[in-house]
UniProtKB/Swiss-Prot annotation:
Protein name: Ribosome-recycling factor
Keywords carried by this UniProt record: Cytoplasm, Protein biosynthesis
Subcellular location: Cytoplasm
Any GO CC annotation of this UniProt entry: cytoplasm
CDD domains, A to Z: RRF (cd00520)
One example GO MF annotation: ribosomal large subunit binding
Pfam families: RRF
Keyword Zinc: no
Length: 185
């Protein structure tokens, strides 16, 4: 039963890591990255559709994204969605593909994005700590219900703390790497 609590906590913490990685992917670092467009949805035949399902996204150069629609008739819809998005990038439509040139980041913008990265990383750590609290509460409930002994509870609490420490360290590493990537010129 104790292993179930730890496995459940590990699984939820892994989901937090994946969520953080998705968040970081959406923060542009001055170079082209297809995940920048993950949050862009296009109204395609009356349905909000993720851009990557109706077009291929390639990176021909370090700071250029090339969006090639599978269906040429959707080009105007894609252009409209990209203009409406909060990416801060103006699409260039040449009639068959859309080019997105990622502008170089100013020093001030880099610092602002680094602050945003820290905030997102801190939110992920809070989520991990909440998962730890839930796991600890579950362990205490089991001890109260006499499903585990007091010694087993102490061991379980140590194991939960170790898993939490590992998860927080991983988040710190991810945050530091993203900050480093942002602050590189």
């Amino acid at each position: 039963m104790a292993n179930v609590i730890i496995e459940k906590a590990k699984e939820r913490m892994t989901q937090s890591h994946q969520s953080l990685a998705r968040e970081f992917g959406g923060i542009r670092a001055g170079r082209a990255n297809a995940s920048l467009l993950d949050r862009v949805h296009v109204e395609y035949y009356g349905v909000e559709t993720p851009l990557n399902q109706i077009a291929s996204i390639t990176i021909p150069e370090a700071r250029v994204l090339l969006v090639t629609p599978f269906d040429k008739s959707s080009l105007k819809d894609i252009d409209r969605a990209l203009n409406a998005s909060d990416l801060g990038i103006t699409p260039a439509n040449d009639g068959s593909v859309i080019r997105l040139v990622i502008p170089a980041l100013t020093e001030e913008t880099r610092r602002d994005l680094a602050k945003e990265v820290k905030k997102v990383g801190e939110n992920a750590k809070v989520a991990v700590r909440n998962i730890r609290r839930d796991a600890m509460d579950e362990a205490k409930k089991q001890e109260k219900a006499k499903e585990i002994t007091e010694d087993e509870l102490k061991t379980l609490e140590k194991d939960i703390q170790k898993v939490t420490d590992d998860a927080v360290k991983h988040i710190d590493d991810m945050t530091a790497n993203k900050e480093k990537e942002l602050l590189e010129v």
